[in-house]
UniProtKB/Swiss-Prot annotation:
Functional summary from the UniProt entry: Catalyzes the reversible conversion of 2-phosphoglycerate (2-PG) into phosphoenolpyruvate (PEP). It is essential for the degradation of carbohydrates via glycolysis.
PANTHER family: ENOLASE
Residue positions of the active site: 204, 335
Annotated family: Belongs to the enolase family.
GO cellular component: cell surface; extracellular region; phosphopyruvate hydratase complex
Encoding gene, per UniProt annotation: eno
Molecular functions per Gene Ontology: magnesium ion binding; phosphopyruvate hydratase activity
Highest taxon in the source lineage: Bacteria
Source organism phylogeny: Bacteria, Bacillati, Actinomycetota, Actinomycetes, Mycobacteriales
Listed name of the protein: Enolase
BP-aspect Gene Ontology terms: glycolytic process
Length: 428
């Protein structure tokens, strides 16, 4: 037995200088752990609700109410429970909140407690978190989907697509993939300088130049890959997070690159991109409630590119089930704070995998030094992780943790590589 004995919480700052919640858990055997909660810039309407204070303090973004919720309601609800009974702990959290969207106590309060309990239980068991959650067979290191050029809500530029990523699919190990990604990142900086473009950074560590549009951004990254001597499409592939909900309006459709477009016109644009560039994955290409558009797009290009539901699914098993039934998307983005407990996150991943959907573990734009998602990526065998550029310590912390996990696994470690993208078949 590893009984939860004490639960504490505090307000800390995330990578954007905004407050977030950190929760600490002490077990009766002396095991101790903490977890910090991330926060998004572009958030889906269907996400679980963060509890913020409002008012003048921290421009309304304080989380003292969420901290108080942990101390006054969550702690009494879970103290005395065996920390290794994660599903029981998380059900106690859900019962304490009592709302479908976690709006009373806040998903940020619930998630902090849920993850801290899991980390404490792993500590008590003498296991690394990835092994504790994933069991004896957890051994696959994910492909890092490195956001090296930022636009949309992550940068103050005119680029509508939110993230342009490189995926080192041809590397033999995670260690090699990280090196390749870092080399492309630095090569991109050189390319931008040569062309007189800005090299300031966006929220997630990627460069944020004000370029003309999607194709120019992809061309710049292609040049950067070439500079390193790596082969585009074989060693390194490309990926996008469009975050289309951010530029969709009822009545006018998608205001994208200077014109209003329909879902069909957006689909035609993506089909053109997939034929012209080695793109393995497109996230949120359409609005979070445009089910018909998603289904049509999946029918059109889902056989040759990964279509990832982020705002569409918000890591919610019920939303994902709806997508599976309708045939919308073919992959799930996994963000623990979208749903608010570890158990619900694992349930969503399990549902995705059982139905042939790929999964990509993901950070948020507002991150901390917490490395939980690195362990979870290996634990669930997602084969893909999105946690920003190979720069800024809150991003690099996750990559460095994956290096440690790969080293820990030794000869048992396997890098997912191109196998993570079975639909990818770029012909150039």
């Amino acid at each position: 037995m590893s009984i939860i004995e004490q639960v504490g919480a505090r307000e800390i700052l995330d990578s954007r200088g905004n407050p977030t919640v950190e929760v600490e858990v002490l077990l009766d055997d002396g095991s101790f752990a903490r977890a910090a909660v991330p926060s998004g810039a572009s958030t889906g309407e269907h996400e679980a609700v963060e509890l913020r204070d409002g008012g003048d303090r921290y421009n309304g973004k304080g989380v003292e109410k969420a901290v108080e919720a942990v101390l006054s309601e969550i702690a009494p609800a879970i103290i005395g429970i065996d920390a290794t009974e994660q599903r029981t702990v998380d059900q106690a959290l859900l019962d304490a909140d009592g709302t479908p969207d976690k709006s009373r106590l806040g998903a940020n309060a619930l998630l902090g407690a849920s993850l801290a309990v899991a980390r404490a239980a792993a500590e008590s068991s003498g296991l690394d978190l990835f092994r504790y959650v994933g069991g004896p067979n957890a051994h696959v290191l994910p492909v890092p989907m490195m956001n090296i050029l930022n636009g949309g809500a992550h940068a103050d530029t005119g680029v509508d697509v939110q993230e342009f990523m490189v995926a080192p699919i041809g590397a033999a190990t995670f260690k090699e993939s990280l090196r390749w990604g870092a080399e492309v990142y630095h090569a991109l900086k050189s390319v931008l300088k040569e062309k007189g473009l800005a090299t300031g950074l966006g929220d997630e560590g990627g460069f944020a130049p004000d370029v003309a549009g999607t194709k120019e951004a992809l061309d710049l990254i292609s040049l950067a890959v070439g500079k390193t001597g790596l082969v585009l499409g074989t060693d390194v592939a490309l990926a996008l997070d469009v975050a289309a909900t951010e530029f969709y309006t009822d009545g006018t459709g998608y205001k994208f690159e200077g014109s209003n477009r329909t879902a069909d016109e957006m689909a035609a644009f993506y089909a053109e991109l997939v034929d012209a560039y080695p793109i393995v994955s497109i996230e949120d290409p359409l609005d979070e409630d445009d089910w018909d558009g998603w289904v049509a797009l999946t029918d059109q290009i889902g056989n040759k590119v990964q279509l990832v539901g982020d705002d569409l699914f918000v890591t919610n098993p019920e939303r994902l089930e709806e997508g599976i039934v309708k045939g919308a998307a073919n992959a799930l983005l996994v963000k623990v704070n979208q749903i608010g407990t570890l158990t619900e996150t694992l349930d969503a991943v399990d549902l995705a995998h059982r139905n042939g959907y790929k999964t990509m573990m993901s950070h948020r734009s507002g991150e901390t030094e917490d490395t939980t998602i690195a362990d979870l990526a290996v634990a669930v065998g997602s084969g893909q992780i999105k946690t920003g550029a190979p720069a800024r310590s809150e991003r690099v912390a996750k990559y460095n943790q994956l290096l440690r996990i790969e080293e820990n696994l030794g000869d048992a470690a396997r890098y997912a590589g191109e196998v993570a993208f079975p639909r990818f078949a770029f012909e150039g």
